[in-house]
């Protein structure tokens, strides 16, 4: 397991992970994306961000049901993590979804 000493802070690690995942999804490298997210989930099982990112990946691959499960898991783990809530609202509506929220800045 990584520690805060290994990676700076958990927040910095998650911010870096989010940006890497965004780039990999945009480059259609789904396998590496999944591996990176799953590793983060193992290292930080209580973090909302990896679930949100896996939800984005699932939605990108057309697996809406799994995507919504991971967005909900992220929201349950951290109700203050707004990207998960935004993605649930965005992808759970009947209108055409907008861009996914990877970070608080999205």
Residue ranges and their predicted role:
Residues 14, 48-49, 82-83:
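Helix-start (N-cap) detector for alpha-helical repeat units in TPR-like alpha-solenoids
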Residues 1-16, 39-42, 98, 103-104:
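TPR-adjacent "capping" and linker segments in tetratricopeptide-repeat scaffold/adaptor proteins
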């Amino acid at each position: 397991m990584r520690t805060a000493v290994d990676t700076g802070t958990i927040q910095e690690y998650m911010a870096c992970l989010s940006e890497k995942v965004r780039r990999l999804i945009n480059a259609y490298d789904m396998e590496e994306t999944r591996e990176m997210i799953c590793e983060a989930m193992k290292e930080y099982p209580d973090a909302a961000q990896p679930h949100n990112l896996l939800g984005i990946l699932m939605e990108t691959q057309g697996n809406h049901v799994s995507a919504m499960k991971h967005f909900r898991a992220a929201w349950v783990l951290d109700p203050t993590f707004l990207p998960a809530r935004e993605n649930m609202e965005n992808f759970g509506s009947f209108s055409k979804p907008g861009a996914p929220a990877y970070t608080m800045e999205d």
